[in-house]
């Protein structure tokens, strides 16, 4: 069985790691290169580095930071934020990223997913979905773009199916309702999408306890769990999470 993954998320704004609640109220959480190194050494399986202001401020991701971070860490590394062209993807992969995450640009031009997958390989193309529960229609989640500021009107489950059909290798699924709250992942949303596509789904938004992480895997059927506040604030360590999940008989890579 393929090992389930724990992935610290580094949301970066103006060169610093930040963390907020429900996509707002950002506070400083440290230097991305230092934090990336720390999590790499602590036993994380991968890292995700998202330049959360890149799309909104119409600037490209800080390639230099990617280069410095990739030189410092020994685990696979995904980079997202403001990537809107094949050249942008190429630049980040050349700078040392293992994968790139597309979000607003994929909604605007879905062919970027298939073009990226054809040129660089599906394994390099992650598509991020920022989803929020529709208040009026049950079992429906809306897709948001531009750092959670704009409702596209797209249905998250239908969009996930299209992403899969276009050749993406992975989906990074963030519950905007859960983001930063530490009230648990949106298990229903995660399960619905995990069951609809046969590529890995990374659960994101809401981890606050060991059982939340276990639930993302067992009930949500995700392949990976994204972690931010929980780790940045020092509430739990990667080691503590892995030891717990191994005791719960989940297929986790032990820390050597």
Swiss-Prot record:
One Pfam entry name: His_biosynth
Keyword annotations: Amino-acid biosynthesis, Cytoplasm, Histidine biosynthesis, Lyase
Domain of life (superkingdom): Bacteria
Pathway connected to this protein: Amino-acid biosynthesis; L-histidine biosynthesis; L-histidine from 5-phospho-alpha-D-ribose 1-diphosphate: step 5/9
Transmembrane residue ranges: none
Reactions the enzyme catalyzes: 5-[(5-phospho-1-deoxy-D-ribulos-1-ylimino)methylamino]-1-(5-phospho-beta-D-ribosyl)imidazole-4-carboxamide + L-glutamine = D-erythro-1-(imidazol-4-yl)glycerol 3-phosphate + 5-amino-1-(5-phospho-beta-D-ribosyl)imidazole-4-carboxamide + L-glutamate + H(+)
Example GO molecular function: lyase activity
EC number: 4.3.2.10
Subunit description: Heterodimer of HisH and HisF.
Functional description taken from the UniProt entry: IGPS catalyzes the conversion of PRFAR and glutamine to IGP, AICAR and glutamate. The HisF subunit catalyzes the cyclization activity that produces IGP and AICAR from PRFAR using the ammonia provided by the HisH subunit.
Stated name of the protein: Imidazole glycerol phosphate synthase subunit HisF
Gene source species: Prochlorococcus marinus (strain NATL1A)
Gene designation: hisF
């Amino acid at each position: 069985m393929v090992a389930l993954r724990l992935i610290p998320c580094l949301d970066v704004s103006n060169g610093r790691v930040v963390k907020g609640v429900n996509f707002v109220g950002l506070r400083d959480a440290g230097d991305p290169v230092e934090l990336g190194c720390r999590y790499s050494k602590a036993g994380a399986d991968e890292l995700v580095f998202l330049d959360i202001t890149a799309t909104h401020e119409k600037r490209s991701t800080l390639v230099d930071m990617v280069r410095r971070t990739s030189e410092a860490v020994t685990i696979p590394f995904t980079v997202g934020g403001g990537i809107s062209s094949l050249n942008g993807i190429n630049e980040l992969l050349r700078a040392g990223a293992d994968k790139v995450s597309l979000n607003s640009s994929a909604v605007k031009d879905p062919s970027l997913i298939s073009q990226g997958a054809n040129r660089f390989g599906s394994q390099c193309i992650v598509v991020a979905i920022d989803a929020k529960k529709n208040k009026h229609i049950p079992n429906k989640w809306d897709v948001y773009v531009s750092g959670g500021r704009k409702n596209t009107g797209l249905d998250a489950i239908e969009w996930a199916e299209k992403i899969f059909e276009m050749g993406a290798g992975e989906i990074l699924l963030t519950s905007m309702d859960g983001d930063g709250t530490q009230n648990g992942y949106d298990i229903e949303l995660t399960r619905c999408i995990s069951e609809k596509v046969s590529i890995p789904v990374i659960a994101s938004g809401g981890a606050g306890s060991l059982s939340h992480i276990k639930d993302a895997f067992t009930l949500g059927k995700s392949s990976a769990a994204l972690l931010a506040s929980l780790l940045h604030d020092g509430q739990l360590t990667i080691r503590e999470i892995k030891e717990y999940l191994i005791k719960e008989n989940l297929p986790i890579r032990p820390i050597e």
